[in-house]
Design a protein with these regions (language model features):
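N-terminal glycine-/serine-/threonine-rich beta1-alpha1-beta2 phosphate-ribose binding loop
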Residues: 1-103
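A short helix->loop->beta-strand "cap" motif at the edges of active sites that frequently abuts
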Residues: 49-51, 73-75, 115-118, 141-143
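General beta-strand structural signal in soluble alpha/beta enzymes
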Residues: 55, 77-80, 97-98, 121-122, ...
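Rossmann-like NAD(P)H-binding beta-loop-alpha module
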Residues: 106, 111-115, 131-196
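Mid-domain beta-loop-alpha active-site segment that forms a flexible
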Residues: 149-154, 200-229
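Single conserved hydrophobic/aromatic residue that forms the stacking wall/gate
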Residues: 238-250
Length: 250
């Protein structure tokens, strides 16, 4: 993988953890993007000195522009969904890590692949909604698709020798069960959004935490696994409250 990274969705949970890795290993950060978290983005710009920054929210773009006005060596700013796509396609972008939340990530994923960039993918919706588009584009352009989601990354690492990849039959995706695991129907009555946001193992963004509590996230991960590893959607799921178990392949 290139040691030059362009990080889409840099201010979210996965984005900030990815920058921890860049900091630890000295990776060059070519570009960053965010939706509206200007203060976090300003701190990241000050530390990592990206050449380009894309901001999709119009008001946040204006706020960031004003904050950077007159600064020497300020990054070039790109605006809106078009700016996000442009950032993903740039020469010199290196490996594009897509940690954008939601369907907005699909266009950026395809843009990066079609521009010849390896794609480290944390955006579930790219494969859930456009799996055939993404996998076809990867094959056509001869790039690497690297899963970032912990379960899929665990499987990917298990399959790095040719024998394992050729003989894969089943994938087991683990599920913590979220904050409501083991509760009876009666115990679930009256639970609130605030309760659902109390994940027992991880501090994540609100959307993925709610998806975890309802097990919707695990359904998305099953679809992802089917596209990533070429298996029918009958992968087995099992519940493991321990965060140490991520995935198992057979």
């Amino acid at each position: 993988m290139s040691k030059v990274i362009t990080l889409l969705g840099s201010t979210g949970s996965i984005g900030t953890q990815s920058l921890d890795v860049c900091r630890m290993h000295g990776y060059e950060v070519f570009g960053l993007s965010a939706n509206s978290s200007v203060d976090k983005l300003l701190a990241q710009i000050a530390e990592f000195h990206p050449k380009y920054v894309a901001v999709t929210d119009p008001a946040a773009f204006e706020k960031l522009s004003a904050a950077l006005a007159g600064q020497a060596n300020a990054p070039k700013l790109l605006k809106g969904a078009d700016g996000l796509r442009e950032l993903a396609t740039m020469d010199g972008a290196g490996t594009v890590l897509n940690a954008v939340v939601g369907i907005a990530g699909l266009d950026a994923s395809l843009a990066a692949i079609e521009s010849g960039h390896d794609l480290a993918l944390a955006n579930k919706e790219s494969l859930v909604t456009g799996g055939h588009l993404v996998t076809d584009a990867v094959r056509k352009n001869g790039v690497h698709l690297l899963p970032v989601d912990s379960e899929h990354s665990a499987i990917f690492q298990c399959l790095q020798d040719q024998h394992s990849a050729k003989t894969l039959e089943k994938i087991l995706l683990t599920a913590s069960g979220g904050p409501f695991y083991g509760m009876t129907t009666e115990e679930l009555r009256g639970k609130t959004k605030a309760d659902a946001l109390k994940h027992p193992n991880w501090n994540m963004g609100a959307k993925i935490t709610i998806d975890s509590a309802t097990l919707m996230n695990k359904g998305l991960e099953l679809i992802e696994a089917a596209w990533l590893f070429g298996l029918p959607e009958d992968c087995l799921l099992y519940t493991s409250p321990s965060p140490r178990d991520r995935s198992v392949s057979r």
